[in-house]
Design a protein with these regions (language model features):
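SAM-dependent transferase fold signal centered on methyltransferase-like domains
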Residues: 1-216
Length: 216
């Protein structure tokens, strides 16, 4: 199953259902306008989605009471920083079967060093304001998500990550275990006056090669 916690029009959920063939897809948004659009778009595409009109935390709180309360894929794509949604988000992943969490950040002015104090407050790291700022910001974002997950003995390994125009996005695969989480944290450090940030690989090479072959 998959959930898009801040789904807006629901297009990502529709694609997960139609293109990826995921059986149970949940789309949620606190906006009543978005809720109406999600229902309309699902109807136009003749697809069954589980559509809700709740705040992200409320949705996860309700789901926590359900038998199948966790998801194989959790998508967090807010306007601005994803930090307020990370704690509930990582706890919603099916961590013992390789669940994936996708996180987007659009507050690139903080992550890329224009507002370093904001980056320090939100992400607990000092950014770079140089030609390396995009990669450094992406690594700071990944670090933040990993730290939140590690509190619950969940290790998050990057599958794919990128920066594009006004946003940064990362896909991280979960594994249960304190030892595994510790190994992830050991790959977090500082770099020439910036950090702490994720110092490991930004993507899984075999996966990216396969993506490239399928695309081109």
């Amino acid at each position: 199953s998959a959930v898009d916690l801040l789904a807006a029009t629901g297009v990502r959920g529709l694609r997960l259902k139609k293109e990826a063939g995921i059986e149970r897809v949940y789309v949620n948004d606190a906006s009543s306008t978005a809720f109406a659009l999600m229902k309309q778009n699902a109807k136009l595409n003749k697809l069954k989605l589980f559509i809700s009109n709740l705040r992200a935390h409320e949705f996860l709180a309700v789901r926590h009471k359900a038998k199948d309360k966790k998801f194989g894929y959790v998508d967090i794509d807010p306007f601005g920083t994803p930090v307020p949604f990370l704690d509930a988000g990582v706890k919603a992943i099916v961590e013992n079967r390789g669940g994936i969490i996708a996180v987007t950040a659009t507050d690139t002015s903080a992550l890329c060093g224009t507002y370093p104090d904001a980056c320090l407050r939100k992400y607990g790291a000092k950014p770079l304001y140089t030609y390396l700022m995009n990669e450094a910001g992406l690594r700071i974002l990944i670090k933040k998500v990993q730290e939140v997950a590690a509190q619950y003995d969940i290790a998050l390994t990057p599958l794919f990550a990128h920066t594009t125009r006004h946003y940064m996005r990362c896909f991280l695969q979960a594994a249960r275990g304190a030892d595994k989480a510790d190994k992830i944290l050991q790959q977090i450090g500082c770099f020439q006056g910036a950090g702490p940030m994720w110092l490991g690989k930004l993507w899984d090479e075999p996966l990216v090669e396969k993506m490239f072959r399928l695309t081109f």
